[in-house]
Amino acid sequence: MNNKDLKTKFIFITGGVVSSLGKGITAASIGQILKNRGLKVSIQKLDPYINIDPGTMSPYQHGEVFVTDDGAETDLDLGHYERFLDENMSKKSNVTAGQIYQSVINKEREGKYLGKTVQVIPHITEEIKQKLIDVALFHKSDVVIVEIGGTVGDIESSPFLEAIRQVRFDFGYHNVLYLHTTLVPYLKKAQEIKTKPTQHSVKELRALGIQPQILVLRSEVPINPETKNKIAALCDINPQAIFEALDVDILYQMILNLHHQGIDDFILQHFKLTNFSNADLQSWKQLITRIQNLEKKVVIALVGKYIVLHDAYLSIIEALKHASYQYNCKLEIKWIDAEKVTPDNISSLLEDYDGILVPYGFGNRAIEGKILAINYARTNNIPFFGICLGMQLAVIEYARNVLHLQGANSLEVDEKTPHPVITKKIVDSNLGGTLRLGSYPCHLKANTKSKAIYNQEIIYERHRHRFEMNPHYVALFEKNNDFVVSGINQEQKLCEIVELKSHPWFIAVQFHPEFLSRPLKPHPLFKGFVEASLLNQKNK
């Protein structure tokens, strides 16, 4: 294919001055506005780190690992993209420097470069450009928004910036747009906005051969027209192409703020795209109004091992918020360090909360504290939601304290346990090495809470796990007619959902429902959990 025959338009988003400016939220917000106007939009994240993917990175380093339907372990920004766009990303939506270099080195070993010296230019840059084309074709996109990780000036980003510089020539001027986000500091003492960091950031970007057509200025105060004109003159940018990204209390306000400033009109004009509908953002306006006028509060205890960095549970936090908004209540999460939970303090730690959630995790650290929390929820009729490891530990807790299987455990924790109620997955997947990754079907059992919540026969949910409930113990667990395996993957005979008949709301799942929750379409399990927690609050 001749690159100039490609019909897709590309928006490249870079960041300057400091990291964590909200490039991902900017990308997701623009994506939602353009989708709303009738365009088919996909978003891609280019990460300059050498890791192949974040799958083996510490949650303290990187936050959560977001899993796509096709089993890719990706950057948490893809969660923002999916939640804002309500579109599924794919493994093509997250590209790392590690993937690029690995691919090029493999091709060199296979002799595909015909003995040439393999260099950053052209081989690495061509590989990056091919990834841009791949995501456009795979998603059949009218517009691909590409976020470049890191900050302009980082040495790791150099090949990516060079590649996106080249695509303007390769794809055509009106098919490419460069958007640069910068910080505009406000000095409270002097009551003055400082533009110098933005000037230097744009200067550095231009030195690399990239002239941004749009600036998005992150600021805690509104930026007056005089300041915008000053930045426009010194950065050689149309004043009409300078937009504010003011600090907001609700992330989704960014969609309305950028649309109100006309960023979508400017983008469509640049791409010479006409005959697209006006944006109808009424549903987002209603959501924001609802959030601003919440009348109740629900308090959830999250008992985890990575609680120092809340981003390790970002999608769970967002899914709980989505469900809470539906019930007109503000979410308050109490972060409980599972390592500090003991039999002596468990009651004082958890007695005041409306619901208890035990999320995922790997390894044996903090396991016993989570099991204590599950036992407390079960024996005190407090709504309980277990996710991934949370389900495995619910199985262990029940085995020990109800079935009296002394020493019951997971093979991940104790390879010599006499009762391995949690074992390694029986059927290996080709995706992600030793992990079961991606979306799989789950058949729901009739006359169960799970079936009532989903109101479907078959559901599809995303997975990321290495261990699971041992199917050889299922009959023993279900013998007393209380413990129910209510969701099963029939193809591989895997236990996906467990629940208790005698408990008001005790459900644990092997998969990650948080990855499918959307602000305008909360996940049914999270809705059910929040509803049960509110009922528990009422009955106290």
Curated annotation (Swiss-Prot):
| Gene name per UniProt | pyrG
Q: Source species, please?
A: Onion yellows phytoplasma (strain OY-M)
Write out the catalytic residues in the record: C388 (nucleophile), H512, E514
Q: Name one GO cellular component term.
A: cytosol
Summarizing the function annotation, the protein's role is: Catalyzes the ATP-dependent amination of UTP to CTP with either L-glutamine or ammonia as the source of nitrogen. Regulates intracellular CTP levels through interactions with the four ribonucleotide triphosphates.
- Sites binding Mg(2+) sit at D77, E147
Residues where CTP binds: S19, D154, I155, E156, K194, T195, K196, P197, T198, Q199, K230
Fetch the HAMAP family from UniProt: PyrG
**Residue ranges of coiled coil:** none
- Signal peptide extent: none
Q: Where is this region: Amidoligase domain?
A: 1-273
Keywords tagged on the record? ATP-binding, Glutamine amidotransferase, Ligase, Magnesium, Metal-binding, Nucleotide-binding, Pyrimidine biosynthesis
Annotated L-glutamine binding sites: Y60, G361, L389, G390, M391, Q392, E412, R466
What InterPro entries does the record tag this protein with? Answer: Class_I_gatase-like, CTP_synthase, CTP_synthase_N, GATASE, GATase1_CTP_Synthase, P-loop_NTPase
Name the Pfam families on file.
CTP_synth_N (PF06418), GATase (PF00117)
Catalytic activity as recorded in UniProt:
UTP + L-glutamine + ATP + H2O = CTP + L-glutamate + ADP + phosphate + 2 H(+); L-glutamine + H2O = L-glutamate + NH4(+); UTP + NH4(+) + ATP = CTP + ADP + phosphate + 2 H(+)
The entry describes its oligomerization and partners as: Homotetramer.
Q: Where is the Glutamine amidotransferase type-1 domain?
A: 306-539
List positions binding UTP.
S19, K194, T195, K196, P197, T198, Q199, K230
Residues annotated as binding ATP are: S20, L21, G22, K23, G24, I25, D77
Supply the CDD domains for this chain. CTPS_N, GATase1_CTP_Synthase
Q: What else is known?
A: CTPSs have evolved a hybrid strategy for distinguishing between UTP and CTP. The overlapping regions of the product feedback inhibitory and substrate sites recognize a common feature in both compounds, the triphosphate moiety. To differentiate isosteric substrate and product pyrimidine rings, an additional pocket far from the expected kinase/ligase catalytic site, specifically recognizes the cytosine and ribose portions of the product inhibitor.
Lineage, top ranks = Bacteria, Bacillati, Mycoplasmatota, Mollicutes, Acholeplasmatales
| Control of this protein's activity | Allosterically activated by GTP, when glutamine is the substrate; GTP has no effect on the reaction when ammonia is the substrate. The allosteric effector GTP functions by stabilizing the protein conformation that binds the tetrahedral intermediate(s) formed during glutamine hydrolysis. Inhibited by the product CTP, via allosteric rather than competitive inhibition.
In which pathway is this protein known to take part? Pyrimidine metabolism; CTP biosynthesis via de novo pathway; CTP from UDP: step 2/2
Q: Write down what this protein is called.
A: CTP synthase
Family classification: Belongs to the CTP synthase family.
EC no. given is: 6.3.4.2
